[in-house]
Structure formats: C-alpha cells, structure tokens
Amino acid sequence: MLQPKRTKFRKVHKGRNRGIAVGTEVSFGTFGLKAIGRGRLTARQIEAARRAMTRAVKRQGKIWIRVFPDKPITEKPLEVRMGKGKGNVEYWVALIQPGKVLYEMDGVSEEIARHAFALAAAKLPMKTTFVTKTVM
C-alpha cells in the first residue's frame, strides 16, 4: 500500500479539507476519473480501486494514480481513557478537493475505460465522473 518512505513529523494536526483542487486536467493518459465531492481517500481505497481497474482492463493499457496518501491518521486503542497523548498512526490518507483527477488511463477503448472507472468508483467514498483529455 502507498505511504511515504519518510516524513518530517510522525503525527500531524487534523486540519480542514478546504480550498480548490490542483491537478484538475487529464495530463498523462487519455481518460480520467475526476472527483466531484470533497473527502479523503485511504491508501486501502486507492489500492482497491487500482486493482478493480487493472482486472477490468485485463492488464492492457496503462494506469496512472494521481493521488498519494501523505497524511497520517491516528487512533487510540479501544477502551482507553481520553488524554495521555495522541494515538498511534493507523493509516494514511490523501485529502481530495472537488475537481481533482484521481486516476488516468491510456491504451484502451473508451468503452473499456468507462467500465473500469465505474468499477473503481464503486470502491471510493466520494462521487466521481468520467473525463477525457481535452485537445486544444
């Protein structure tokens, strides 16, 4: 699963997921899966969607993952009283703003790409849409 090799700090503040997305255009492939909603993707969700797409295209074409989980999420163990410091890092997430391209695909037909992205979207906790590269 995806996670940073090393970070400056082990734990980070919760923060807020505001602002506008960076990376809103399809830049590597021909087709893309774009987030409509705001939220956060765990490393497990990113990997599950990638596997669903890879199986759908039968290992042909190329897939790019445009998001990376770089924010650690901590949890305290069950039945532990409040206080006594911040919990341990349990998983990593990527914060997603509306308009962010999550995955890109190339080397397959549009019909196959739409089917693969539909399978991937079912694994994700936010609304997404299918986009194609705009040629100017």
From Swiss-Prot:
Keyword hit for Repeat: no
Protein name: Large ribosomal subunit protein uL16
One Gene Ontology term, aspect cellular component: cytosolic large ribosomal subunit
One BP term from GO: translation
Gene source species: Haemophilus ducreyi (strain 35000HP / ATCC 700724)
Pfam families the UniProt entry points to: Ribosomal_L16
Gene Ontology molecular function: rRNA binding; structural constituent of ribosome; tRNA binding
Sequence intervals crossing the membrane: none
Role noted for this protein: Binds 23S rRNA and is also seen to make contacts with the A and possibly P site tRNAs.
Protease in keyword set: no
Similarity comment text for this entry: Belongs to the universal ribosomal protein uL16 family.
Summary of subunit composition and partner proteins: Part of the 50S ribosomal subunit.
Keywords, alphabetical: Ribonucleoprotein, Ribosomal protein, RNA-binding, rRNA-binding, tRNA-binding
UniProt cross-references to HAMAP family, sorted A to Z: Ribosomal_uL16 (MF_01342)
Residue ranges that the Swiss-Prot or TrEMBL entry lists as coiled coil: none
